[in-house]
């Protein structure tokens, strides 16, 4: 058999209907020159928020929290693209000590799920399409500069967990990917605002984004979260709500895709919530604590109680607290 001139049909879905059926608002095919609309029935479904993944761009950046379907949709796109066009795909992350730490398993699972097992050869950590000769390779970028520089000819690059990719790695990888029409797909959950991936690929465009999307002839940047995923699972929703209740800062980072404000030095970082309560007679306390502040440090005082939950677990309740900068010791309440 020979390679096809166009891809299968992608259905763009904005929501699920009451009966659970996807509401397909557009049907698209990838072609040799771009993307075209069709009336044919789709065989691949992707959320509306990820539609720009299908259109040619040098850089495609998708960032946000867990449950958005970022990685799953990129995997579907790359597998289908390799079925109709000869592709040499590099799947990278900053550190990859073994193939188990790569996206290899996700790609193989997608091949099996779509029933393409006869088309692909998946052996020894490499994936090859029998007809198009497309090939997927998996590497870590860190301390691998020579190997990466030797990968000239890559047509597609998929960078996962890109929040961890260093400036040195970007400076090595980007010039290596120089084939005509080559694409670099960057997927990540933001961590710190100083991370190179953020400063290179999102920060320059953040003020130009409209409804979380920026695009020009060279780059598309999309903020995508669980609210944009019609197939956000009930299990993930339960996990999200649990995290939101007990560890709000972590919830904002993991699911809302905001910066990680947690400090590992904070003993109770993310492990607190604000509630209305009255101390119970069974609780230990009251315990009073004070920390005298100097210069710009606040003087703080607390009245606390401890609830013994058993099994070595305890809840700490802060009933009253006070904090003020520039407080004279003689004025301490």
Where are these regions (language model features)?
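ASCE P-loop NTPase helicase motor core
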Residues: 164-244
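Pre-Walker A adenine-sensing motif
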Residues: 38-56
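SF2 helicase catalytic motif II
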Residues: 153-166
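Nucleic-acid-processing active sites and adjacent nucleic-acid-binding tracks
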Residues: 303-333
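TOPRIM fold recognition
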Residues: 1-29
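Walker A/P-loop NTP-binding motif
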Residues: 71-85
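Inter-Walker segment of RecA-like/P-loop motor cores
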Residues: 98-155
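ATPase catalytic-site recognition across NTP-hydrolyzing enzymes
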Residues: 229-293
């Amino acid at each position: 058999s020979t390679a096809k001139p166009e891809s299968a049909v992608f259905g763009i879905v904005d929501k699920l209907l009451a009966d659970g059926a996807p509401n397909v608002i557009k049907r698209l095919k990838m072609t040799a020159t771009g993307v075209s609309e069709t009336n044919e029935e789709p065989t691949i479904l992707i959320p509306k928020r990820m539609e720009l993944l299908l259109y040619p761009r040098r850089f495609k950046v998708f960032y946000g929290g867990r449950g958005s379907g970022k990685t799953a949709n990129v995997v579907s796109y790359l597998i289908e693209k390799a079925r109709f066009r000869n592709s040499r795909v590099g799947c990278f992350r900053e550190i990859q000590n073994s193939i188990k730490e790569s996206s290899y398993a996700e790609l193989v699972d997608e091949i099996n799920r779509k029933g393409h097992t006869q088309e692909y050869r998946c052996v020894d950590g490499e994936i090859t399409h029998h007809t198009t000769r497309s090939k997927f390779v998996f590497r870590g970028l860190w301390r691998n500069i020579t190997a990466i520089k030797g990968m000239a000819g890559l047509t597609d690059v998929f960078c996962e967990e890109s929040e961890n990719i260093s400036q040195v790695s970007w400076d090595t990888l980007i010039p290596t990917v120089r084939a005509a029409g080559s694409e670099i797909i960057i997927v990540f959950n933001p961590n710190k605002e100083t991370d190179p991936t953020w400063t290179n690929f999102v920060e320059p465009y953040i003020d130009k984004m409209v409804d979380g999307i920026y695009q020009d002839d060279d780059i598309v940047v999309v903020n995508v979260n669980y609210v944009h995923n019609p197939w956000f699972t009930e299990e993930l929703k339960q996990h999200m709500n649990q995290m939101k209740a007990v560890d709000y800062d972590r919830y904002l980072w993991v699911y809302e895709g905001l910066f990680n404000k947690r400090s590992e030095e904070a003993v109770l970082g993310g492990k607190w919530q604000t509630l209305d309560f009255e101390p119970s007679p069974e609780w230990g306390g009251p315990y009073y604590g004070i920390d005298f502040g100097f210069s710009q440090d606040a003087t703080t005082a607390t009245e606390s109680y401890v609830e013994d939950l058993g099994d070595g677990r305890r809840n700490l309740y802060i009933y009253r607290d006070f904090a003020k900068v520039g407080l004279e010791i003689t004025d301490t309440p």
